[in-house]
From Swiss-Prot:
Binding, Mg(2+): 42, 115, 118
Family of the protein in this entry: Belongs to the ribonuclease III family.
Gene designation per UniProt: rnc
Protein known as: Ribonuclease 3
Complex formation: Homodimer.
Keywords recorded for this protein, A-Z: Cytoplasm, Endonuclease, Hydrolase, Magnesium, Metal-binding, mRNA processing, Nuclease, RNA-binding, rRNA processing, rRNA-binding, tRNA processing
Length: 226
């Protein structure tokens, strides 16, 4: 297996440096590419993600009902959310895929991207411990946990846009940061969103990349309604 050329960049994006880099390599390996693939790590990561998010929601919402907690957890750990996280990390650029999956665009396939996120979580856990993994996940989910509320619709603009495109079997939206201004503690992000059905790109500007992406996605949804 060839080494992944941009692995240090991916580690910086993830916010975690692996002691055993082979664990990350395995987490990025689809079963179509090698016998030592990421499915067992995915199984582990799925369980860890569930307990970390469950614990965070339990303490964040002391008055929420079991039903509300379950719905919020489902929103945060479902495949659509994991796919969006994978896109934010640009995981498709790092995946090991077999020739067939590569040719068919597996690096964009939602299930493969979501599974890779769970596998990376499992890899981080094996490389460190549960508390290190918890701290990393809470960092990944900080904005989503800050925004989510019990008893209301949990779907944000990026999720709604993704579901709309999936319904028509269209490619996922492409988000690119085209400009960052300001000091590290007071930055403004400009993000461009492109989809197959629109000839022009749509721009979102906000104080974080994710917020800018949400603004751009909301504008695309409005254009699609016209």
């Amino acid at each position: 297996m060839e080494p992944i050329k941009n692995l240090p960049r991916l580690c910086r994006t993830l916010g975690y440096e692996f002691k055993n880099i082979e664990l990350l390599t395995q987490a990025l390996t689809h079963r179509s590419a090698a016998n030592k693939h990421n499915e067992r790590l995915e199984f582990l990561g799925d369980s860890i993600l569930s307990i970390v998010i469950s614990d965070a929601l339990y303490h964040q919402f002391p008055k929420a009902t079991e039903g509300d907690l379950s719905r919020m957890r489902a929103t945060l750990v479902r495949g659509d959310t994991l796919t969006i996280i994978a896109q934010e990390f640009k995981l498709g650029d790092y995946l090991y895929l077999g020739p067939g999956e590569l040719k068919s665009g597996g690096f964009r396939r939602e299930s493969i991207l979501a599974d890779a996120v769970e596998a990376i979580i499992g890899a981080v856990y094996l490389d460190s411990d549960l508390e290190v993994c918890r701290a990393l996940l809470l960092k990944w989910y900080a904005e989503r946990l800050a925004e989510i509320q019990p008893g209301i619709s949990q779907k944000d603009a990026k999720t709604l846009l993704q579901e709309h495109l999936q319904g028509f079997k269209k490619p996922l939206p492409d988000y690119q940061v085209i400009n960052i201004e300001g000091d590290a503690h007071d930055q403004t992000f400009t993000v461009e969103c492109r989809i197959e059905d629109l000839s022009q790109s749509v721009i979102g500007v906000a104080s974080s990349r994710r917020k800018a992406e949400q603004i751009a996605a909301a504008q695309v949804l409005e254009l699609l309604k016209k």
